[in-house]
Amino acid sequence: MQFPGSDVARMIGDSIFVARESLPKQTSKPSTKAAPSNIQERRSNCRVALIGFGTVGRAVAKILCENGDGSLRLTHICNRNVERKKQPWVPADVVWTDDVQSVLNSDVQIVIELIGGLNPAEQIVRSALGSGKSVVTANKQLIARHGPDLLQLAASKGCQIEFGASVAGGVPVLPSLRTGLCGDRLHGIAGILNGTCNYILSRIENARIPFSEALEEAQARGYAEADASEDLDGGDARAKLAILALAGLHSRVAPESIRARSIRPVDAVDFDYAAELGCTIRQISRADLKADTLFADVGPCLVPTDSPFGRVQRNLNLVLTSGQYGGDMAFLGAGAGGDPTAVAVVSDLMFVAESLSAGGGKRGAASNVSTPEISSDFETPWYLRFFVRDQPGIVARLAQIMAAHRLNIDSLLQKPGFEKSSLPFVITLEPCRDSLLHPALEEMAGLEFTIRPCLCLPILR
């Protein structure tokens, strides 16, 4: 699989789901009242409990309370400090509580878990499934680490667990992988899965501002946490990639087994050099299944400026899939936010309710999940950016090391106008495996003229 340069992937309009939130903004903010109107068509009268009343939980409750006809009946809302959370628009017969066990002991049929994290979310979800209650969750950490086990537990108890909101927020990529594309044999998935990183990188690209300034702007706009390490260093994206691998490639992957590279070293000058190569820079999460090996990686990459990935701006998400029969598909939209994520949660809720009431199908059986070997040893062209103290013989020394490691130089780029005490220049390499490149990088890191670690980025064509 080649992302994003294949012909089908370039024709992004041919096979694409565009989420509502990715369309041009309207003059007035969309209301949660515009959520799926066919809630009223579900006649299951399912009793639903909501655990977690933060941004997403509140939006979910608002959709259920303002658009429902009682067929999906919210009966419990559970949260810490619950008295401070109460809202006048919630019906008077809804039970507000901070006692999770009382919710699990009640007669609810579906539990919505929106507290996030592993503890106590894992125990809550296992308890609910163990008692035969279906679960809807947006918890990426939980599904990334325990998804296969939870799917098996649900199957053994005759209930369901749905997690469509755990990746890409309001973009229905996970339901599509588990239902709409289940007839295909997918072999590759790649995506822009973290809106924080995409916002920062696209701001550096468009304004040529320092990384630190772009991060501060993202934090001021609410796109990045005060401690954004999980986003910047790839932890968030690799958890999401593990979920996509489970849903689309039927592969059990521990998130920590996926190599994650930080976007922190990316400099504005890298966008200048990337532009000379017809590229820009994005954080790309990619997984490619070949026989019994899953090649997986998360980190900044050079992508063609006119490719689907290169055109994604701000905090949007894009997922591309490649299948043996159906070819390439693209899913684009808002990857975070209360309303888009709530729509995904409610859509999962409706699917479960319809299954309970009408004997509908279940998604995502875990019986065919395999545990492949995980590798980051992709073969690809490479972009190497150095910062050096200028002196004679630098290129010759670097070329000598690369030749010793059987690496072929493709091009050398050097822009004028920089101080000789801190001179950036770029070497691009012909395709080679990661395992050949890194011993050479370790050797070059010890050269006396280097003043920053070499930035090494894959070039995706």
Could you tell me what each predicted segment is?
Residues 67-89:
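NAD(P)-binding Rossmann-fold cofactor-contacting core
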Residues 122-127, 140-167, 174-177:
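Rossmann-fold NAD(P)-binding glycine/threonine-rich loop
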Residues 16-20, 24-25, 29-45:
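A short, basic/flexible loop-to-alpha-helix module at the beginning of a structural domain
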Residues 100-138:
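Rossmann-fold NAD(P) dinucleotide-binding segment
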Residues 213-311, 316-318:
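Substrate-binding/catalytic subdomain of NAD(P)-dependent oxidoreductase enzymes
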Residues 95, 186-190, 196-201, 205, ...:
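Catalytic, metal-anchored helix/loop core of enzyme active sites in primary metabolism
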Residues 3, 13, 29, 51, ...:
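A conserved regulatory-domain signal marking ACT and ACT-like small-molecule sensing domains
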